[in-house]
Amino acid sequence: MTRNDLLDRLATTQASALETQGLGLVPMVVEQSGRGERAYDIYSRLLKERVVFMVGEVNDQTANLVVAQLLFLESENPDKDVSLYINSPGGSVSAGLAIYDTMQFIKPDVQTLCMGMAASMGAFLLAAGAKGKRSALPNSRIMIHQPLGGARGQASDIEIQAREILYLRERLNSILSEVTGQPVEKIARDTDRDNFMSGDQAVDYGLIDKVITRRS
């Protein structure tokens, strides 16, 4: 399988996932090459430029696709940055942590950019980008809060789930403290309820490094 075939398969799978989420049909682009015309879906074309999209809910399917693309781009060039564009309301903590761990694991720096909304795990992953390379567009909204969960069943089962949620809250707060420079105690207070921020407020908080109005 050639490089272009791998790119097509990865991005076409992502395109299908986005359509499944009700985000509409994915546009196609046509390029001229020495062998004639070639049609790409738009995500395949952008993946060739090392751009990965995380759009919609963070779930296992999203995580598998993002992780696969990050690993592939690392194998292509371990010294060239990857750009992760985020427009997400958040979702599964375990799926988000799979993406986070992969971002830290691979050699290339991962630049993150919020366009629209980065909430919950979306904001967490936005802040987890390489220091100095985390940004947002001017009208983006960023929201942090503590993990949500519910439990049912016997009292012992509910106790187990409660302990797990408390562990995840402490772990997420610890990571947010590392990437923002804020004390863990402040993170815990600020994530007790939904905490919305503008791009400039997110810069002051340390979640991102800059607000971008135009491509440089």
From Swiss-Prot:
GO aspect biological process, one term: protein quality control for misfolded or incompletely synthesized proteins
Keyword Protease: yes
Record Pfam families: CLP_protease (PF00574)
GO cellular component: cytoplasm; endopeptidase Clp complex
Catalyzed reactions per annotation: Hydrolysis of proteins to small peptides in the presence of ATP and magnesium. alpha-casein is the usual test substrate. In the absence of ATP, only oligopeptides shorter than five residues are hydrolyzed (such as succinyl-Leu-Tyr-|-NHMec, and Leu-Tyr-Leu-|-Tyr-Trp, in which cleavage of the -Tyr-|-Leu- and -Tyr-|-Trp bonds also occurs)
Alphabetic keyword roster: Cytoplasm, Hydrolase, Protease, Serine protease
Enzyme active site: 120, 145
GO molecular function: ATP-dependent peptidase activity; ATPase binding; serine-type endopeptidase activity
Subcellular location: Cytoplasm
Gene3D superfamilies cross-referenced by the UniProt entry: 2-enoyl-CoA Hydratase, Chain A, domain 1
InterPro entries, alphabetized: ClpP, ClpP/crotonase-like_dom_sf, ClpP/TepA, ClpP_His_AS, ClpP_Ser_AS
EC number: 3.4.21.92
Role played: Cleaves peptides in various proteins in a process that requires ATP hydrolysis. Has a chymotrypsin-like activity. Plays a major role in the degradation of misfolded proteins.
Subunit structure as annotated in this protein's UniProt entry: Fourteen ClpP subunits assemble into 2 heptameric rings which stack back to back to give a disk-like structure with a central cavity, resembling the structure of eukaryotic proteasomes.
Family membership noted in the UniProt record: Belongs to the peptidase S14 family.
Identification of the protein by name: ATP-dependent Clp protease proteolytic subunit
Annotated source species: Cupriavidus metallidurans (strain ATCC 43123 / DSM 2839 / NBRC 102507 / CH34)
Gene: clpP
